[in-house]
Amino acid sequence: MKWKKSLTGLSSYKPGKREEEVMAELGLTKITKLSSNENPLGTSPKVAELQADSSVETEIYPDGWASSLRTVVADFYQLEEEELIFTAGVDELIELLTRVLLDTTKNTVMATPTFVQYRQNALIEGAEVREIPLLVDGAHDLDGMLNAIDDNTTIVWVCNPNNPTGNYIDLADIQAFLDKVPSDVLVVLDEAYIEYVTPQPEKHEKLIRTYKNLIITRTFSKIYGLASARVGYGIADKAIIEQLNIVRPPFNTTSIGQKLAIEAIKDQAFIEACRTSNANGIKQYEAFAKRFEQVKLYPANGNFVLIDLGIEAGTIFSYLEKNGYITRSGAALGFPTAVRITIGKEEENSAVIALLEKLL
């Protein structure tokens, strides 16, 4: 086969082991997954009710425009419906963005380490990837990213809060950054974890009307607890949305996914409860880190913590796994002596912390 040259050296995404597989290998009767930043509280009771009662005509294609969901989300953010695009998770939106803006003559700027799909999709398109190392505290080096932009740059990625460090860039700094980015360079502000930020930032969706080169990406996979439904969305100027719709598959979000997302976004009381629970979980890890001088906890603003214990990441990962907790080794994330741990329920956090204390 005459494969694209840009695929040479690239690997496919390797999902972690299934919980059942880990239990069988290690002889465990219970395993707690804290590796994929899923919501430990599940999803809204209203979503659960819909799942129990809903019937979907599986022989009928879904609404390709996601009309009902579009209306609800537009109303929630006080946006125009044409300022939204819905995709099969943010992963698909990232793919669409790289498809319309990158090729072998272009480059893209991003932090490192950050969400790996930016780099992966850019390389698939044959583009040059310009990675700017994070600052010592895990924050984006925004000045360094600005300096990396040239006439061939078409996309700049800003993951906020950043995955895997958890650092959050406040709105004033985002606006100052946007003021300096050339108007023909798209800034992707990936806010997959924005609902977890405490206190919640000022509403800023309408920045897209000031900055015509901005797209804000969000998801129903994290705090809304709909990871398996695969519903993400972008907020941008109508001209950007129009270009993305040219390459968007016609029926890319499912009927059930659209229905579940509608119920999920309506239940903001559940979202507030999740945010409070998550903030309390972060406090548990902060208290743990303060007790041990050798432990470095990166600023946590998502639903996960990145903890550097000064011990080889694989050792920490294996130790926790053998004791019934699946986490994410920092070795694959650019942090060789750290692990990323999803914030769980209070008792789960306490159990992991107790194990880490024994390891130290």
From Swiss-Prot:
GO molecular function: histidinol-phosphate transaminase activity; pyridoxal phosphate binding
Catalytic activity: L-histidinol phosphate + 2-oxoglutarate = 3-(imidazol-4-yl)-2-oxopropyl phosphate + L-glutamate
Keyword set includes DNA-binding: no
Modified sites of kind N6-(pyridoxal phosphate)lysine: 222
Pathway terms, separated by semicolons: Amino-acid biosynthesis; L-histidine biosynthesis; L-histidine from 5-phospho-alpha-D-ribose 1-diphosphate: step 7/9
SUPFAM superfamilies: PLP-dependent transferases (SSF53383)
EC number of this enzyme: 2.6.1.9
Spans traversing the lipid bilayer: none
Cofactor(s) the record lists: pyridoxal 5'-phosphate
A GO biological-process term: L-histidine biosynthetic process
Recorded coiled-coil stretches: none
Pfam families, alphabetized: Aminotran_1_2
Keyword field: Amino-acid biosynthesis, Aminotransferase, Histidine biosynthesis, Pyridoxal phosphate, Transferase
Subunit structure: Homodimer.
Family the UniProt entry places it in: Belongs to the class-II pyridoxal-phosphate-dependent aminotransferase family. Histidinol-phosphate aminotransferase subfamily.
HAMAP family per the UniProt record, alphabetical: HisC_aminotrans_2 (MF_01023)
Protein name stated in the entry: Histidinol-phosphate aminotransferase
